[in-house]
């Protein structure tokens, strides 16, 4: 399925290009640690860890720090004991937000997110208050230039029981990207099988895909949303932010 969609602005590794390198590294290292803890600390046998390492290398995270993160995952330190927590909230213009975090202190993270949202007339919601507006899916993305043809990827994805493949032009780079969308329970297998046939994906992750999008045309509200997103993205615990708004 070709065209413009909410995937056009997806941030594979959260944060704008001008984000501080140290902050990017912090988020990448956390993902490596969590991925290594969830399976074998070997990317050959752990697809999530492999994806995390690929993302880290693209951001030029030094190899010694990647290795150190994997090694720390086998330890038992409280500071490296991160858990994945998804927070739900509303922002300016009543937009819905699904905020995915890796945190070692739920109370701290919740307090910081609540403060950020309230600053821009938003609020942190209870579990289930926003998620019903989204479908939880897996996304595996490939640059069109890295694939022989769309049909080849599409046919393979459908054979693996993927839900769809979207062909999107990225707004910032004008580069064509193919997004394979699958059920959460199939995500690991689809990612692994695509890797074996097409090699490394540009990125892959679980994504909250809005059932419907809300178009925000008011410039003042657009500005508030942009400022809120920047503030949330500057939080070290926040990995990804999925939403249901568009400015287009």
Swiss-Prot record:
Domain of life: Bacteria
Coiled coil: none
Keywords: Cytoplasm, DNA-binding, Transcription, Transcription regulation
Subcellular locations according to the entry: Cytoplasm
Record-level GO BP terms: regulation of DNA-templated transcription
GO cellular component, one term: cytoplasm
Matching InterPro entries: Integrase-like_N (IPR017856), TACO1_YebC-like_2nd/3rd_dom (IPR048300), TACO1_YebC_N (IPR049083), Transcrip_reg_TACO1-like (IPR002876), Transcrip_reg_TACO1-like_dom3 (IPR026564), YebC-like (IPR029072)
GO molecular function: DNA binding
Residue segments, region Disordered: 1-21
Pfam families in alphabetical order: TACO1_YebC_N, Transcrip_reg
Region forming the signal peptide: none
HAMAP family named in the record: Transcrip_reg_TACO1 (MF_00693)
Family classification: Belongs to the TACO1 family.
Protein name: Probable transcriptional regulatory protein ECH_0704
Species name: Ehrlichia chaffeensis (strain ATCC CRL-10679 / Arkansas)
């Amino acid at each position: 399925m070709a065209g413009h969609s909410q995937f056009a602005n997806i941030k594979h590794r959260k944060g704008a290009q001008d984000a501080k390198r140290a902050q990017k590294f912090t988020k990448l290292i956390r993902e490596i640690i969590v991925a290594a803890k969830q399976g074998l600390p070997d990317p050959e046998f752990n697809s999530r860890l492999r994806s995390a390492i690929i993302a880290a290398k693209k951001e030029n995270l030094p190899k010694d720090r990647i290795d150190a993160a994997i090694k720390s995952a086998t330890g038992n330190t409280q500071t490296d004991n991160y858990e994945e927590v998804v927070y739900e909230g509303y922002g300016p213009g009543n937009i819905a937000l699904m905020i995915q975090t890796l945190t070692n202190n739920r109370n701290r993270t919740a307090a910081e997110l609540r403060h950020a949202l309230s600053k821009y007339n938003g609020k942190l919601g209870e579990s289930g208050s926003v998620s019903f507006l989204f479908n939880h899916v897996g996304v595996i993305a490939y640059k069109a230039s890295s694939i022989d043809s769309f049909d080849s990827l599409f046919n393979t994805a459908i054979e693996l029981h993927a839900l769809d493949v979207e062909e999107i032009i990225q707004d910032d780079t004008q580069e064509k990207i193919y997004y394979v969308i699958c059920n959460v329970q199939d995500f690991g297998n689809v990612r692994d099988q695509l890797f074996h046939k097409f090699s490394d994906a540009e990125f892959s992750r679980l994504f909250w895909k809005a059932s419907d999008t809300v178009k925000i045309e008011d410039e003042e509200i657009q500005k508030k949303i942009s400022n809120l997103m920047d503030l949330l993205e500057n939080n070290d615990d926040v990995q990804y932010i999925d939403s249901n708004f568009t400015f287009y």
